[in-house]
Structure formats: C-alpha cells, structure tokens
C-alpha cells in the first residue's frame, strides 16, 4: 500500500428505502409545493458484485463495497455511514483489474479489513425505473427509484463447491427516495414530505439498511447474525465504544480531515487510560503488550498533532498582533514550518496505520472487548472505582507543590504535566463509572494543564526558531513577544490550579457519599 494513496471522489448520499409488494402502485408527487415537474428517466439494468471479508466485517460496520456495471455511475462504490438517512459514497472508476479492489478505496477501510482477504460475498441485479423531481429553479430535488431486485449470495455465483450460508437466490421489490445534494446539505423536511407520499401509496420503511444487508440476513443497519453484544460492565462498555471511535477517526486520518490526528490520538489515550486503570478487570499485567502498543501509537500520532496545534496556535497569535509587531520571516518559520512538520508527521502516521503491527493491536483490542462481552457472571472481577485514580492525582499534586517550592521551572513543568495525565485517567474512569461531576472537574484540570503544557512546548519551539532566525540575521522581536504571551498564559494556568483541585476534591467526596 503506497504511503500516499489517491483520494477517491466523495458524495453525500441522503436516502430512505421502503419495502413494497409487487402490486403496489408507484406514488404521485402532485400537490407538493416544492416539486414543479417530474420526469421519467430511462430504465436501467444495474449489476453489482459486493465485496467483504469472510466474516463480513464491513457489513457489521454498516459499510458496503461494490463493483457495479450499468447506469450512469458505473464503477466501484464504497458507502460509509454518515448519520440518519445519510451515507458518504466514495467512488473509483472501473479498471482492467476486474475484481481487484482499488487501493484508494481499500485504504479507507483498512482498519476494518486489515490483512484479511476481501472477496465477493453477493451479486445483486437491479431493474430500475426512476423519476427525477425538479424544483421551481429547474434544479433536481430528488430521485425516486422503483427497483425489482434479484440477488445471489456468494455460493450461487462462485464455482461449484463454494460455501453458501444463505438462499441461492432472492427476489424482492423496493423503493428508494434520494435527495439530490450538491453542497453537502440535505432538506430533511422535503425528504419527510416525499416519504409520506410513499407511505400513503402502501410502502413500509425498509426492514434492512441496504440491499446487501437483506441478502446477508440483517434486519436493521449494522445488524448481522451472531454479532457481539455490548458489554454490561460500564468500563468495558466504555472501552468498546472507544474502540469503535478509534476506527472512525482512523478513516478521518486517512482522509486528512482537520483535527483527525488529534482526535485519534485522544481516543487512543482514552483506551489506554481505561485499560491501565482496569488491568485486573481485563486480565492484563502491568507490562501488558496492548498498553505499550497504545502508547507507541499515541507517540507516532503526536508528531502530526503537535505540529497541527502549534501551527494553528501561531496563526491565531500572529493574526491578533498589530502588523508592525510581526517582523521578519516569523510567519514562514512558525506557521509554514509547522504545516510542513504536520505533513511529515501525517506520512509517518499513515505508514503506522498500514502496518501489520497496527492490525495486531486492533485484533487485540477486538479480542479484549469480545472476551469481556461474553464473560460469565462468575468471571466478573471487582468493580472499577475512582478511588485509586484520585489518589494518584493527589499524590501528583503534592509532588508538584514540592517541585514548585524547591526546583526550577523544568521540574515544576514536568510535575504539572504528571497531574494532567493522572487527571485525564481519572476523568475517563469517572465517566465510565457514572461519576459525572468528578469527570467534569477532572476535565477542567486536564484542559487547564493541557494549555500549560502546550505553552511549555511552544516556548521551547520559539527559543529554537529565534536562535535560527538570529543566526540568519533576521529580526527576532516577534519571537520574544510571543514567548512572553505564552509565559503569561502558563502563569494564569498555574494560578487557577489550586481552586480546580479543591473543586475536584469536593466532587470526589460527594461521589463517595
């Protein structure tokens, strides 16, 4: 897999599906104010082969991957969930490689399929009659499709002897109603009005999320037979939810979405914090491999994250200064330099996200979640509480006070950073166990000292860049100005810490009552 995979075209699909019987008559859209005319489109014959892993991992994540011929949009289509009635469709053209999935689409879902084979699981043939609904301005508003569907599971169109766990052939009729979106927005009120016409005509909301889901036996989006149930224990449920979030942010990082690297790193550290504070409950040892791997992943993502944060920070600070105070090549060195470092860090992150090492980490996380979901009541360990995590925060706060009284700035900053890390762990554990007020107060400390740590990193970087600028004979006035602003920010954070710690202590005491 290349480090720089091509970016596939994206399209927001907003649609609803409906089940209808053979005798149901297509609806009329007359009388809907937004619709001024309806045009019949040429009949289409669509033939699609759907691809997935042997265990249908894509389908379990409400994702479909198909190679379709026929119609105006023939090609490879990857559809990802994007909210109620919405999916993000990514496309790639057909090629001479036949059933080889395009690299740019496979890369998007690599964290789900990993190194498993992606192979045909179903073939669906659709005879489509469609109508385009137009508005007063002449723009297309929506498309109504009347589909007669014939579908075969994998064994029915593979060579003799291939496995087939479902019926050889299925036939049904369904309607689709899709908004025509050009700017990424959707008029859900219009969709509701149009959908009511379909319901009035005798249709029913589809009992499946997609044609493929119906072939595979799913009755609702993302549901497949024998799918894992969410863990009952709150901490294990929190880990399960964060693993799901990790896969979502993985896709965003691959798309280079803004703040995605940062959020994936945050999610990675949440999982690590929850596992670290619940090692016995998960059957992990102090030096558990999975915890170490999560730390390594966060470190790799941190290169791009730090550069992105610094670049945005310097951009805001420089924009806020009067023009005469921005001297020399300071913007080029601080902002443009951060953006270059971000791209370097992103490439490093993508290499890591395409590695066998990363796939094995994801396998291990899946196993942890699955094992706890199927644990019997006799295997349950003592419930996780906030007590141990809070004791670590208090210990770190006491050490920070000693460091502030006896040591220099470096030791003080390290001690404050330790408080932040332990407050973060307390926050996640408290949130998972229902101690919401404790979680909120811990978040205040985490944010406060996060700003302090960003200031520490920023000042170190400003010194380095000021030295480089001075060596090059450039004006260094602005570097000094920004440095002082960062120092003032750090001082304000330290001044607010004591009050924040008192509020946290009060919240913990109340949670224990």
Curated annotation (Swiss-Prot):
PANTHER family for this protein: CHAD DOMAIN-CONTAINING PROTEIN, SLR1444 PROTEIN
Domain CHAD intervals: 228-506
Protein name, entry field: Uncharacterized protein Rv2226
Ranges for domain CYTH: 11-219
Family matches, as SUPFAM superfamilies: CYTH-like phosphatases (SSF55154)
Pfam families the UniProt entry points to: CHAD (PF05235), CYTH (PF01928)
GO cellular component: cytosol; plasma membrane
UniProt source species: Mycobacterium tuberculosis (strain ATCC 25618 / H37Rv)
